[in-house]
Amino acid sequence: MIGSAPHAALNLEVARRSLVLLRNDGVLPLAGGFAADDAGRARGDGGPPRTVAVVGPLADDAQTQLGDWAGSSGQANWMRDGQPRDMITTVLDGLRAHVPAGWAVTHARGADILTMAPDPEGALFPDGQPRPQVVLPCPPDTALIAEAVAAAEGADYVVAVVGDRIELVGEGCSTATLNLVGGQIALLDALAATGTPMVVVLLASKPLVLPDSALDAAALLWVANPGMRGGRAIAELLLGLVEPAGRLPISFARHVGQQPTYYNQIRGQHGSRYADLTQRPAFAFGDGLSYTTVEYADLRVAPGDLAPTDTVRAEVTVRNTGTRPVLETVQAYVSDDVTSVSWADKELKAFRQVELEPGRSATVRIDVPVADCAIVDGRGVRVVEPGDFTLLVGPSSRDETLLRAPFTVRPAG
C-alpha cells in the first residue's frame, strides 16, 4: 500500500542506494562521519558543535523532490495541493532531524528558479487542445543571495541544493538550455566566493551542464528525484551514516556543444575532439565515488574459444584499500574488436555488486552470455560475428579505469 510503513522503508533504501557522489575533496562525510543512535540520528563524537547552512531553491521543495508524474507535477494533477507535506522529507528536513545534538542547521532560499506565464501564441492549439504555459527564468535576486551568503559565512559547511523544478522536465517540458535556470548559478558563484566548504546537491532527473562553482565545490552529489524519504537518505550520506553506492546511468556533458554525450560511442568517427574542447564528459556513465578507495586487479577469462551459445566466464580481484566499508559496483563491458558494420566501441553487458570491509578483497565472478555480444549486421539481422573480443572490467565506463582481457568467438557449427 502506497504510504505504508513498508513502502516508506523501501523508498528510503532505494534512495540510499541511488545517490551518486561525483566529487569529494575530503569534506564528506561531514566532521569525519558519525554512527547512528537508536533513533537513526548521528551520535555526537565529543567534537565541537558545527553549523550547517542549507541553502538553495530546492532545499525545502517537497513536490519537486518527487519528480515527474507525481501528484501536482504538471503531468499528473490529480492531487491539486500536492502530496501530503508531512509524508515528505526534504534535504532541509533530513539534516535538521539527523545532525548530532548541539549542531545548528540554518536555512536560506538564495534564489528563485522560474515563474510560469501563458503561451504568447495563445491559450489553445489550432485543434483546440490547451497550450501549456511557458517558463520564465527568474533573474538573480541580490537580497536572496545576500541572505544565503550571510548564512554560509556563519557556518562551518554550506549545503547548496540546486537543479531542475518539475516544470523543466518530463512530457512537453524540454528545455533549450542544459544550464541551471534562474538565479542558481549566481547563487553558487556567490557561495563559492565565501570560502566556506560547499557541498552541492544536484536535484535533477536529466544531465545538466554545471558551472565551475559546482564542478569545483568541495563535494558534488547527484540525487535525481529521490522520492518521499530522499531528504533523510541525503542527510545520512552527508553525515556518514550510510556509504555512497550509486553510479551514473547517464553522462554529464562539460559543454552543451558536446551533445549527444554517451559512453557507447560508435567507433570510426573522424577525430576525438572539437577545435576548442575534447569529447570527454564532465561525468561519465558508471561514475560514482565512495568514502573509501578500491583497487581492481587480475582480470582473468577462462581459456578456450567460445561458441555463440557459450558464456564468457571471468574473474577479477577487487580490494578495499581504504578505511570505510564499500558496496562496489563491478562493471563489465564488451568491445567487438572488428565488426562488419559500424558499432559501439563498448557496451555494458553485466555488473555485480560486492560488499567489502576495509582491507578485505574478493574474487568477483562475471558471466556474459556470448549471445549478448551480438550486433545488427548489414541485413538488419542480430548476429554474433566470430572473431576477437575484449572484456573490460572496472568501476566506470571510462577507458582509463578498465582492465582488459581478450576472448575469441569461433563460427557456429
What are the language-model segments listed below?
Residues S340-V376:
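Intrinsically disordered, low-complexity Pro/Gly/Ser/Thr-rich segments with frequent PxxP/GP/PP motifs
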Residues G3-S4, R109, I113-L215:
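Hydrophobic helix-and-loop "lid/oligomerization" segment in the mid-to-C-terminal part
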Residues M1-L92, R96-D127, V134-L136, L203-L327, ...:
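Secreted, periplasmic, or luminal enzymes acting at the cell surface/secretory milieu
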Residues A70-S72, D112, L168, T175-T177, ...:
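Active/binding-pocket-proximal capping segment
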Residues V159, R313, T363-R365, T390:
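Hydrophobic beta-strand signal
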Residues R324-A332, W343-A344, V376-G378:
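Short, hydrophobic/aromatic beta-strand segments
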Residues D372-D388:
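Short glycine/proline/serine/threonine-rich loop/turn segments at secondary-structure transition edges
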Residues Q65-G67, V169-S174, A214, A344-D345, ...:
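Short acidic, glycine/proline-rich loop/turn micro-motifs
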